[in-house]
Every structure is written in C-alpha cells, then in structure tokens.
C-alpha cells in the first residue's frame, strides 16, 4: 500500500491521489459575531496569507475595532449597532437584512470559511444565513466553529446545538471545537482570556491547515480541485495538526495529527482524508512513507486519501508538520461517532505565553498538567445562568 503513495501520476487502482497541477483559488474567511471576529483578527495579526478576510457583526463598537476594513454591519436598522442580545433570532434577522452586502462580499469566491462561536446571538443566528448565501452562489463552504463551555448554561448550549444544526444544512463541511475540551489540555492557572486565546489559535490552525494546502505549491501538490472533491457535501469534518522534531519526527507528527483531544471524535470511519506534510530540505521520502502509513492505518481501507508534500526552506528547527482533514462520516451508514484517542502524546510544557505554543500542543493535548475534565465525569449539571460573560469574550 505504501508503494502506491509514490506513483508519478494518478493511479486508478488506488484511492490515494497525487496531483502536480496548481489551481489558484479565491478563498475568503468570514468571522461572524464576537467569537468569529476574535478568531479572524488573530489570523490577521498572525499573518495568515493567501486569503481575503471579512468581519460581520451586529455590535458596531466591536466591529469598528476589527483588523480589516472588510466589515459588514448586520442589522443596522433592526439592532442599531447594539448587538443581538444573545438572541439567535435577532442575529438571523440582522443577517437577512444585510443579504445584499453579504452576497457582494462573498461573490467571486471559490471557497469560504465561516468561523463563529455557537451559543450567542450573532454568530449562532447569522452564520447559517451567511452559509446559505454562499451555497446559493455555488461556493465550497466550510464552517469552523466552537461550542460553549458547559458552565455557560443550558440555554447557551441548546442555542449552540440548534444553530449548529442550521449551519450544517448549508455548509459542505463543518469542523466543531467544543470549548469543554480545553479543560483536558490547559492548567487551572490559565485565565479566561488565555483560554479563549487558545481556542482562537485552534481556529487559526484549522483554517490555515486547509488554506496552506491549497495556496502553497508543494513537491507533491494538492490543489483546490483535490480539496473540493473531499470536502464538498461531506458533512462533519475533523482536523488535526501534528509537529515534531528529532528521531521519528514524521511518525510522531502523524500520531499527533490523528490524536486530537480538542476535537469531537477520531478520524476512524472517515470516507475522505486530505493530508499535507511539510518539512525542511532534510525531509526524506521514507519519512513521508512512514507518516502516510500511520494515517492509512487509522482510516478505512476504501477511504479516499489525498496526500500533498511541501519543502519549506524557512524551517530551520528540523521539524515536520502534518495537517490532516478527515470528512464524510455521515456517509458511513449514519453511524455515531465515538471520542477515541490514538497513540500517545509527546511531553510538552507551557510557560504561559500562548504565542509560543505550537498548534500541535493544542491538537495532541501535549501538556504535563492533566486537570479533571467535565467530559470525564465531573459534575456537569450545574446551570450557571447568572454568570455574565464580557462582550469581547462572548462566542
């Protein structure tokens, strides 16, 4: 099976395809609401390239502080710039009011990422409207969203679930990051702001993982047509990023990429997988083979696996980074997904500076501290509805 990975052209007897042609694609990233806006602003500050950014919000004050001039005020008449008040129906009407402006913003895109925090008013209500408009324009549309912490209350959880169901009606694929999973990978000493900063970093890596695959030419190249073939109408999607150095770095990076504690389930059962392997000039063909074998072993035999590789001369630390996007779970007899961990996590530490963390630290859960998670039996029945969340942290 591994030998099939290195065919010079598409091998019709194998579901692993390598392409050499480059298709430039028009990619737009839309941050909807406060949470989505925070994520997009972080992407801009980090220098994510090759994409066009848009911010859409009902809160004019928050919108005016955005890092891009591409901004749309949602519901200028209905909300008068004061936000949606945690009411998704208000967010939905506000987006419908701005239908023409949203259409003009999305027009011409080949692919649109919609990032939002589910559970509040604007992101929850407006994101599905934006996705619907993108679908009507024939754009490949991917949602990258978060779900609220359990302690944010049942109402917010329920609103998030309803909003996510609506979003799924219109996107080709959606990557969901439950905020509760943060409790598995962050220490108790982290502040609320630091914790949400980690969520924004994960959203950044999710978008960057796909945009880099499309926009950065590789030795074994994956283009937009490849991505579209796997992502289009694929339903739920999972994404992981691994990064490792030293002996066995490719295998370790692959294990990290399929061992994501911040996502909702494993890649087992995926019908389509996109893989990008990036390393410095010293990356060897056997390392690519080893990493590919790890990923193949984690998915079904008949899954379509598209692998691209790129050599980045700026990588000077001897590391290899692997991005895995897995899709098509609903196509497998509607079977339910189980939260499963693959492999083992590498040891890592966190010094309190979020900017110095590697994306793989988030996705593999590679931290020394292992606090009790609400997903592991802690009391999740408390309904803290009286907690006020600052506007800039509302997802």
Where on the chain are the PLM-derived regions?
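Tubulin/FtsZ superfamily GTPase core signature
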Residues: 1-395
